[in-house]
């Protein structure tokens, strides 16, 4: 069983890495926070931590990432976010990471074009704080 302090540290790590990669575009964090055998389940990004600096370098000047809620259980951390400038419409995502010994070892994501609240059946936004 993963201790509550480790779960909290894992959440903080994922938040820090997402900020470094997508907000500050800082590739210097890769060796420290991504495991050498980093497994990537996004079909557009290769396995391995060496793909991260390439990803950063291909972010458009107008690209913007906004973090949302973050939840964790055991060694898994999920962070809700909005990506603007990755395509013609903003994307809302849930990024899921497996963390082992203070490093990201595996990543999955679920991405969807954002539907504005005013055009959704519920009238609720896809991306908001809890």
Question: What are the residue ranges of the model-derived segments?
Answer:
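C-terminal and inter-domain tail/linker signature
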Residues: 1-130
